[in-house]
Amino acid sequence: MITVEDIQIKVYQLLKEKLKAVKLTGSVGYTRHDFTKEDVIILSKGSEGSSDLCVGSIVVNIHVPDIKSKKKDGSILYDINFPRLMEIRTATIEALNSYYNAEEGYNWVISHLDPATKEQDQDEHFFPVYLEIYIRHNK
């Protein structure tokens, strides 16, 4: 029986391959290690349902460091790197929407997107992309 965690691995493999073109300064993975680099982090949120159909969710967070600049008074200012966030988010959405395999007993849809959010205690912003997972169990 396939689980959301198994599908999380498929999402990882897909994004690892498809996001090569955007040349992340960090990586595609499951946890953050270096907040000074761009990362795409995949988090499983579990599933619930019957023996025939389970619904689960995965969140793909796109992290991009803010742009550092100096103000005239010499103080440091951090601004959202919105163009880069959008570039990586667009490539991520295209990759996720490109995948479909009816033979494996599951599928996903992008259920919603949140706006860019400031990462608490870090000089970066992130975009979450929410996947709703449908797992069909054949008897």
Predicted feature locations:
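Short acidic low-complexity segments
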Residues: G26-K37
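Charged, amphipathic alpha-helical segments and their flanking helix caps
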Residues: M1-L24, S44-K139
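A short, hydrophobic beta-strand-centered structural micro-motif
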Residues: F35-K45
